[in-house]
């Protein structure tokens, strides 16, 4: 619903009691500035298909360096061996064979969790991310956020006039703004939005909008006109 945790306060509370903190940052990464180290979290992860503008199949995992030695990998794969030297006897000259050399040392980086060859869809997404991440970095998450906030504030101001209740905190600065109205799915709102070619996330009694740099105030006004 757009609520944002004070992660530093959460982490301080958890760490004082010996607990570790995992943060799902899928609605943060790429949508607004976020310093994963300053937040204090021990783990953070996100997909690439939302605000990073990628697709399904790849994601990102952050693990605080001091926590890495405490982890156990569930699956072992050859990407996790930092010095793998594979030799396949059928393709080597006579006498050239030597044993495969490898070492599964202690965890030192993200490769500790990688399992093996990426699937075709993941490879395609990797190519897509090489472009989308450059685009997001060039724009800058702070600029993306600054562009979006006036759009969200306008929505928070106007949508309640149509019988909705805003369930997003009024000072939220994230990428989503949500509204609730009982019986929304059975009303004429979904039909009106579809006719106006306005695409939002609709539930039975709620809807969520996620404006970004590819939207402007004209899009907001078109959405409001479709509601009325």
Predicted feature locations:
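Pyridoxal 5′-phosphate
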Residues: 1-228
């Amino acid at each position: 619903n757009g609520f944002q945790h004070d992660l530093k306060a959460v982490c301080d509370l958890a760490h004082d009691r010996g607990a570790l903190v995992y943060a799902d940052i899928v609605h943060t990464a790429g949508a607004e500035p976020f310093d994963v180290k300053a937040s204090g979290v021990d783990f953070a992860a996100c997909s690439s298909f939302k605000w990073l503008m990628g697709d399904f199949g790849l994601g990102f995992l952050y693990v605080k360096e001091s926590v890495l030695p405490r982890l156990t990998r569930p699956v072992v794969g050859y990407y996790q061996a930092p010095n793998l030297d594979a030799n396949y006897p059928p393709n080597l000259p006579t006498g050239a064979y030597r044993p495969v050399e490898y070492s599964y040392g202690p965890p030192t980086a993200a490769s500790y969790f990688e399992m093996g060859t990426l699937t075709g869809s993941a490879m395609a997404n990797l190519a897509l991310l090489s472009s989308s991440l450059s685009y997001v970095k060039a724009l800058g998450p702070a600029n993306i956020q600054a562009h979006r906030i006036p759009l969200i504030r306008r929505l928070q101001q106007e949508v309640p006039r149509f019988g909705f209740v805003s369930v997003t905190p009024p000072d939220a600065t994230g990428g989503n703004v949500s509204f609730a109205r009982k019986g929304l799915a059975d009303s004429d709102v979904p039909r009106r939005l579809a006719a106006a070619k306005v695409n939002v996330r609709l539930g039975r009694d709620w809807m969520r909008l996620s404006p970004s740099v590819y939207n402007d105030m004209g899009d907001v006004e078109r959405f409001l006109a479709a509601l009325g």
